[in-house]
Design a protein with these regions (language model features):
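Small/polar/charged residue-enriched interaction surfaces, especially the RNA/DNA-contacting tracks
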Residues: 1-164
Length: 164
């Protein structure tokens, strides 16, 4: 009987339960993640250029895109989001080379994965960070990403503003 119980417990429930639990979660995260990123997000980079050649951060990164991302990450606590930004803020204050800043940005990914694993953040957060990391090529991009994150954090901290 013990062998049958072990075989049944190991074989049937694990095989049947794992797909039943994981499949909807994985399918939901995989299917919904690309849909949730705003259309055209990062397609033209962080910056626009004036007629005279001056580069400036596109306003949607601190406006429309930041507000949209904050509403999609609304289930996340603002303190958890701010903990992701902590190392980025430290690297901004110091005179560091670009590589050190890029490392600080890259450190957000494992922290985001941990938050998603603990169900404290949606899977969209990981996709969002990966997409942004792929577009950071220099200090200007890093600072644009940082400003974008701070705007998202601001909207997350004030949910009443988003709903109005």
């Amino acid at each position: 009987m013990d062998n049958q119980t072990v075989i049944n417990t190991t074989g049937e429930p694990v095989t049947e339960q794992a797909p039943a639990v994981d499949t909807p979660s994985t399918a939901t995260a995989s299917d919904n993640t690309p849909v949730y990123l705003p259309a055209g997000y990062l397609s033209d980079g962080y910056y626009a250029i004036t007629d005279k050649g001056a580069k400036y951060l596109r306003p949607e990164f601190v406006g429309k895109y930041a507000e949209t991302m904050a509403s999609l990450l609304a289930d996340m606590k603002p303190t958890d989001f701010n903990s992701l930004l902590r190392e980025m803020k430290r690297s901004k204050k110091k005179t560091l080379p670009f590589e050190a800043r890029l490392t600080a940005a890259a450190e957000m990914l494992p922290k985001a994965l941990a938050l998603v694993h603990r169900k404290k953040a949606p899977a969209l957060l990981v996709t969002f960070i990966k997409d942004n990391l792929d577009h950071i090529r220099n200090d200007d991009d890093w600072f644009a990403y940082h400003r974008h994150l701070e705007a998202i954090g601001g909207y997350l901290s004030m949910p009443a503003i988003i709903k109005e």
